[in-house]
Structure formats: C-alpha cells, structure tokens
Amino acid sequence: MQIAKILLSAVKLFPLDYLIPEDLSLNIGDLVVVPFRNKELTGIVWEFSNVPEVKKLKTIKEKVPLNLTITSEVLDLIKWMSNYYMAELGSIAKLVLPVDIAEKPIKVKEQKINNNFTLPDLSEEQKQALQMLNDSNKPILIKGVTGSGKTEVYFYLIAEYLAKGKQALVMLPEIALSTQIINRFKERFGFDPIIWNSSVTKAQKKMILRGILEDKVKIVIGARSSLFLPFKNLGLIVIDEEHDDSYKQDDGVLYNARDTAIVRSTFDKAQIVLCSATPSIETMYNANIGKYSVINLSSRYKNAVLPNIEMIDMTKEELPKNCYLSNILIKAIKNNLENKEQTLLFLNRRGYAPLMLCKSCGHKFTCKYCSSWMVVHKSSKKLECHHCGYQSKIFNSCPECLEDESLAICGPGIERIEEEAKTLFPNSKIAVISKDHVKNPEKIAQLLHQMENLEIDILIGTQMITKGYHFPNLTLVGVVDADLGSNHADLRSSERAFQLLHQVGGRAGRGNSKGMVYLQSYYPDNIIFSYIKDEREDNFFVNELEVRKAADMPPFSKMASVILSGTNEHKILEVAKNMVRIAPEAQVKILGPASSLMSKLAGKYRFRILIIADKKFNLQKYLKFWLELIKIPSFCHIKIDIDPKSFY
C-alpha cells in the first residue's frame, strides 16, 4: 500500500503518514488537503513509501484546487534550514505556508507588467554598477555611501528581470521602510508591488500565496518572512540594508534571513544582491575573500555632498538639571529653524526615562518577570518592560520604604527629548517616530508625508528613522547620546554602534544643501567616532576584522549558542552544568554556562553555553550527538541558535 508523508505546519517534528486514494495521482511538493484531528489542513507531499496495509491511517482527501505545488527548490530550502538551523520541519513549513489555503479557489488578480518603465537616468558610476551586476555570477554587495542611489540601481535590475518574465523579491528589515520604497516603486514602474509583512491580514496572505503559486505575482517587497514565499520563477533577490539585525529571527525558528536568502538563490538559480552603506562584518569578510563581488558607489546621487560630522564633548557642557541638549546643538537647531530647514534628533531609547528609583532607599523599579528596569512612559502614565510588555502604574511613593516624594526619574528617553525640544522651540512643529508613536504603516506613511511636505520642523526618532529614509530638506542631525550601545559586553557592539551612527548621520544633507551631524558624547575619544567623523569606514572594517581574527571569533570561526531556560533558576543551572560536564571531546571551545545578559525573561531564568569551532567543523552534527547524551527534564526548555547575533 502506498503511503504519502505529508508535511504539516501543525506538526513540528516530522511529516505524518496518510493513505493515497487509488484515483489520486500525486507528486512530491503537491499541496493536498488532509484530515487532522477534527479539521482539514493543507499539507505538502514530502515523500512516498510502500508499507503493508495499515488500518488506522487516515486518507488524503484531495489536492488543493488548481493543483498547486511547492517547487523542488523550496523543498530543498526547507531541508537545508532544518539541517543547518536544527529546526523542526513543521515549523519551517509554517514559514512557507503561514495560512491555510485549503478552501475554494480564490480569484487572484494578476500583476499587469508594463515594460515602458519611467526609470530616471543613472550617473556614470551607477551605470558601471549596473553593468557589473549583469556580468557577475556571484552574490553581489552594493556598498554605497548613504544617499548614493543604491535603490535606483537595483530598480533597473528589477526592470530587466520583469522584462524576462521572472519574479523578483526585495527584502527590507522593517515594515517602516517599505512606505517610501513602495511610493518610489509605483512612481518608477506604474503599478503596485505586493507587500508581505506582519501587518498583512490573513485573507490578504491567502490571496498573495495563491497569486505566487499561480505565478500571477511578479514583484514582492517584504520583511524577512517574505523569503519563504513559494515563488515558481524567482529570478532576483535584493536584500536592502543587509547589515540590519532585524534579519535575524530570535523566536520560533532561529534563522538569519540574509544568509538563508543566499542559500535560496543557489537553489532557485536566482541572482542575489546585498545593499548597505555599512555592510556587516561577515559580508565584508566574504567580499574580501572573493566569495562575493563588490560594487562601490562612492558619490551621493545627483552630486549631493556628504555631511560634516562634529563631536560635542558633554563633559565640558554645563547643562541645567534634566536637560540633555548641548548649547552647541541648541544653537544649530535655532539656525536651522531660521533657514526653514529640517532637523532630526536621534536617541535610541523609547519612553520618557529608562529608570525610576527611590532617592531614600535606592529601590529600583524592575520588571516582575524579567531582569530589566521598567521604562517610564509619561504619555501613557505607565511603567513598561520593553522585553515582555508587562506594565504597571507610576507610583507616587516608594513601595519598599513607603517614602513620599522620594522617586526620581533617571536619564532621557525619546519622550523626554520631545518635552525639552518643545520647551526650547515652542513655535516649531515637532513630531516623534518610535514603535510607541507609529504602530502601523498608515501612521508611518502619514508622518513621512508630513516630513516630505515640510510640515515638520524637528523630527525626534529612535533607530526606526535610521534606515533608508530620504528627506531632501533635512540638513541637521543631532545624536543625543552617541555612547549608547557602544560599550556593551557583546561581540558585535562596536559594529552595531558604528553602523547605527553612520546610518543616522546619513539622513542629513541628501538634497541641495550640505548637512551637519553632531554627536554628543561623554567619551569623545572613542575610536569609533574618529572612523565616522573622518569617513574612514574601510579602516573600521579592517580593524574590526583584525580584532575578530585575534579572538578567533566569527567570521573566522563557527559559533552556536545553547540557551537553557525555566522557572527554577537553580535547577536550570544544574542542567546546564551537567550538559557541559558530559560534552563530547572534540576540537571545540565551550564557554559557560553563564547567565544570559537578560538573565530572566518573561518569568524564565536563562543560561547560555557558547560553542566555538573551526569553520570546517560540522557543528550541527556535534550538537545533535551531544543533545542525545542528555535527557532534558520537562522543566527545562532548550533552544539552539546557530550563528547567534546577540547574547541577551
């Protein structure tokens, strides 16, 4: 009797066996409707086997209408991800089919491609870049200064693939970034791209999946999950802002969408293009060893000039209590307002203040579920944990010593900078962009429209505003706390700080007027600032690679992280210690166990073991063997993170 193994997103570990009806002809990759518990689900035909008659097996009901199939290339990607990231097949299947499409056929509107595109003229440098893109058969890095027109170059490439009848995917790290790109796309190509991100409804996702499976959708702009869409005829993948940490998923299936996209491009025989003004260290390493081709765009588009960058030594500033904008920056903002030009104030910290404490007994308000401070949000009049979302009221007296009027709010958040700016510049139009202030694409689009139409004088933003936005009249950027994030005990803290400051500075002077960037710092001699100030990003990459090589850290080695978590701190630590004690002998370096930087998260205590090995070592095989040696207690949850990006 022939059995089909059906991969279901509802079953994480392995495909389930189903009987094949005699009148049903199936192929690997076909989408079928199967009974599962008390409902019917869509599954993927994974493989076939012949077994003696089995009475208890359920029978496949039918093929999904229109005989839709998942290509062998996507199936290969699922297998690769399961092996490389040590993830359950069903969890990866849910990435490919996030909604069930086992329903009556949905009428999908086909994207009408008009090849008479109105693309703008390219500069000579951009034309050379396009020629290199056409000539290369490797992954390509477009490394261009902020505002160099990387988007215009890959728009030309998209046009070429659409003319060939191919599908194209443009990946962006944030939903917020998509608004301006979509508008530019519609302006250039004359039709709407399909958008795929967390704001897309379930019904819309069903329609999009159908359209892709029927090859009616030609161009998708999406977040990291768009990588798993079941394209039939994928010709091009573009990863914009490839360095961004948002491409790494830290829950569910732990994967890096950038790295997985490169693998997918090999399966689909598609061209892949990585874009960034500040590429990741891993990408620069691959470029240096010849694995990737590199295109350098050294000039800003339409001859715009790069901004000047100046340090402000905050140790020499005498500021009033609870004020955070230096006299130099205030004067520059006043100048900008007089010249009718826009200003961006950047602080990568949400809320009003990062800490509330008691001046009498020293009590700090921390999250009851996490090892983190509660952030003061004045606008909502609440304390909030930015890790698990727990909220509480703002107290009038200390809950520990009961002292009245003893509570102090420490440090600035973005709301506090807004308050200070409104006091200093009462007649200016001020807006704030952060996850708390703009929670959906419509709000973002509205704010961007206001910026473009000069309805905002001062924009105050978190890292949301650093990625790819183009405001021609924005000529001044003030970084309120340039030290934030640069001194963390983290492999990538210097890299992240450099990228963030470089990107936010790149928002200034993208139009006809030259820009100015001020970095406020209590440690102005930090070497990172000199790299940014003197436009020596290549020196930064060389130095950072040397540091990593000396420490035998990625990209010169492989790394995996084993995270153990549970509600009993002592028991979890004992499991972690025992795991290290029985680790198989091999050419690996094992560090830990140690408390994660976030030692308690959502009520669970967390310990981390790091494993470092030579690049040629089969780390996954080693980890599988190691995990088979230990019986994991039910109170302990284990996650494997291959190529970890953070250590929180």
Curated annotation (Swiss-Prot):
UniProt binding sites for ATP: G144, V145, T146, G147, S148, G149, K150, T151
Comment on bound cofactor: Binds 2 zinc ions per subunit.
GO CC annotation, single: primosome complex
Domain Helicase ATP-binding: residue ranges: 131-297
E.C. number: 5.6.2.4
Positions that bind Zn(2+) 2: C367, C370, C385, C388
Keyword DNA-binding: yes
Reactions accelerated catalytically: Couples ATP hydrolysis with the unwinding of duplex DNA by translocating in the 3'-5' direction; ATP + H2O = ADP + phosphate + H(+)
Domain Helicase C-terminal: 393-548
GO molecular function, one term: ATP hydrolysis activity
Cofactor(s) required for function per UniProt: Zn(2+)
Enzyme kind, highest EC tier: isomerase
Binding site for Zn(2+) 1: C358, C361, C398, C401
Alphabetical UniProt keywords: ATP-binding, DNA replication, DNA-binding, Helicase, Hydrolase, Isomerase, Metal-binding, Nucleotide-binding, Primosome, Zinc
Residue interval(s) of motif DEAH box: 240-243
GO biological process: DNA recombination; DNA replication initiation; DNA replication, synthesis of primer; double-strand break repair
Job description of the protein: Initiates the restart of stalled replication forks, which reloads the replicative helicase on sites other than the origin of replication. Recognizes and binds to abandoned replication forks and remodels them to uncover a helicase loading site. Promotes assembly of the primosome at these replication forks.
Subunit structure: Component of the replication restart primosome.
Similarity comment text for this entry: Belongs to the helicase family. PriA subfamily.
Protein name: Replication restart protein PriA
Species this protein is from: Rickettsia bellii (strain RML369-C)
Gene that this polypeptide is encoded by: priA
